[in-house]
A protein has these predicted regions:
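FIC/Doc superfamily catalytic core
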Residues: 1-12, 17-29, 34, 40-316
Length: 316
C-alpha cells in the first residue's frame, strides 16, 4: 500500500497540516498508521468529513440575538443589549430615565414608579428605541439606504412632542438648518444629496471597523434630521456591525466626553481617541458574551479586534 505524509495529505485535501494531524489522532482516517513519529496516511484515503456544527450553537452575534429575541428568552444577551444600549444612547442625549427605570419599561411594558419630573418624551423614546433595536436585529442584512435610515428615525420619534410640531419632519430630513455645539452641519437644502453620496460611498467601501466609524462621523456631520441624529447614527452602527461581523459596541454614558471629543478630533484628522473609545465599548459587549455563555463568540470577537488592530498598525 502506498502512503502519503501529513503535508501531502494537507495539500491534497485543502487542510492545514495541524488539522490532518488531529484527524489522525482521532481515528478519522481509515488505515492510518504511525511510523516512528510520523503519520502514514493511505494514498487513496478520502478527506475526512467536516464535523457537523452543534445544533443551536450561534455562529455570530446576530444569530444569537435573533434566537434569543424570537425565543423571548429573558435575562440573556438580547435582554442586556436592549437595556444597556437604549439606556446609554438615550442618556448621552439627556434622558432623565435611570437604567433601572429603562429596564422596568422593557421588561414590564409599564411605567412603574417614574418621578413626575421625567419628561414624557423620555419614556416614549425609550419604548420606541426598543422597537428600533428589534428592527435592526431582524433586518440587519438589508442594504443601508435612505429609506432604511428614515424609517429608524420615524420609529424613534413616533408619538413624541416633536412629532406634533409643524416644522418637524418625523421620518424625513430636516427642514431647518441646525448646529451641533460649534460644528456647522449640512444645510437642510443639501441633505438629500449629501446622504445619497454618503450611502453610495459606504456601499462600495471596505467594511472595516475604521471605515464604519468614518461613516458615523460623516453622518453626524451631515446631521440629516432635526433631532435624533445621534441615536439614529448609533443604531446604524449597530446594524452594520451585526451585518458585517464586526463586534458591536455600547458607548456608555461615562464615555460620553471621550466619544464627543473623538468625533471632533476625527474630523480634524486624529482618529485614535474615537477608535479607542469604541473598542472599549466592544469590550463591554465581549464581557456580555462571556457572561451569557457565548464563549466561542467572545473568542471570535477578540480575534476580530486583533485583526483590526493589526490592519491599523500595518497601515501606519
Amino acid at each position: 500500500m502506498k502512503y502519503m505524509s501529513v503535508a501531502e495529505a494537507a495539500g491534497k485535501w485543502g487542510l492545514t497540516p495541524r488539522s490532518v494531524q488531529i484527524h489522525c489522532q482521532r481515528g478519522n482516517i481509515p488505515g492510518v498508521t504511525m511510523l516512528g513519529k510520523s503519520w502514514q496516511i493511505p494514498a487513496d484515503a478520502a478527506r475526512p468529513p467536516r464535523k457537523p456544527r452543534a445544533k443551536g450553537l450561534p455562529r455570530s452575534i446576530l444569530e444569537a440575538l435573533k434566537a434569543e429575541k424570537r425565543g423571548c428568552i429573558p435575562g440573556g444577551l438580547y435582554h442586556r443589549l436592549q437595556i444597556d444600549f437604549t439606556y446609554n444612547t438615550n442618556h448621552i442625549e439627556g434622558s432623565r430615565l435611570t437604567r433601572e427605570q429603562t429596564r422596568w419599561i422593557f421588561e414590564t411594558q409599564t411605567l412603574g414608579e417614574i418621578p413626575g419630573d421625567v419628561p414624557v418624551d423620555d419614556v416614549v423614546e425609550t419604548a420606541n428605541h426598543f422597537r428600533c433595536i428589534d428592527i435592526v436585529i431582524e433586518t440587519a442584512g438589508a442594504a443601508l439606504t435612505e429609506r432604511y435610515v428614515k424609517n429608524l428615525h420615524a420609529q424613534l420619534k413616533s408619538g413624541t412632542t416633536d412629532s406634533r410640531k409643524e416644522w418637524f419632519e418625523v421620518g424625513g430630513y430636516k427642514r431647518l438648518d441646525n448646529v451641533v455645539g460649534d460644528m456647522e452641519t449640512c444645510p437642510a437644502k443639501d441633505v438629500p444629496c449629501a446622504m445619497a453620496e454618503l450611502l453610495a460611498w459606504w456601499k462600495n467601501a471596505e467594511k472595516t471597523f475604521e471605515n464604519l466609524l468614518d461613516l458615523h462621523v460623516r453622518f453626524e456631520q451631515i446631521h440629516p434630521f432635526q433631532d435624533g441624529n445621534g441615536r439614529v447614527g448609533r443604531l446604524i452602527l449597530l446594524k452594520e456591525c451585526l451585518k458585517h461581523g464586526i463586534t458591536p459596541f455600547i458607548i456608555a454614558d461615562d464615555m460620553r466626553q471621550f466619544y464627543y471629543l473623538g468625533l471632533q478630533e476625527w474630523r480634524q484628522g486624529s482618529r485614535s481617541r474615537l477608535l479607542d473609545t469604541c473598542r472599549a465599548g466592544q469590550d463591554v459587549v465581549i464581557a456580555g458574551l462571556k457572561h451569557f455563555g457565548h464563549e466561542a463568540l467572545a473568542r471570535q470577537a477578540l480575534a476580530e479586534q486583533e485583526k483590526s488592530e493589526a490592519r491599523k498598525t500595518s497601515a501606519q
